[in-house]
Amino acid sequence: MFTTTAYNTLGEVQESETQNDSWAATEMCLDMSMLYGYAETTDLWGRHYGDYGDRPNALGQRVY
């Protein structure tokens, strides 16, 4: 399971979606980043899977 979360430039959550397929999650992440500016995908345990766009400063630096 992969959860993709989209954020606006202020770091506010705009949309979130869960996918079972890793490739579908990657495509969703790219689509959401184009709509909102930044999106990231995490796995079932909250580990970073991928992101697209410019990470808002309000979210802080991502720890991998």
Where are the predicted features?
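Charged, amphipathic alpha-helical segments
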Residues: 20-28, 62-63
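A short, exposed loop/beta-hairpin motif centered on an aromatic-Gly-Thr core
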Residues: 11-23
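Short aromatic-glycine-(Arg/Gly/Cys) micro-motifs in beta-strand/loop hairpins
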Residues: 1-14, 43
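Short stretches within intrinsically disordered, low-complexity N-terminal or propeptide regions
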Residues: 8, 26-27, 41, 60
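Short, mixed-charge low-complexity intrinsically disordered segments
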Residues: 34-64
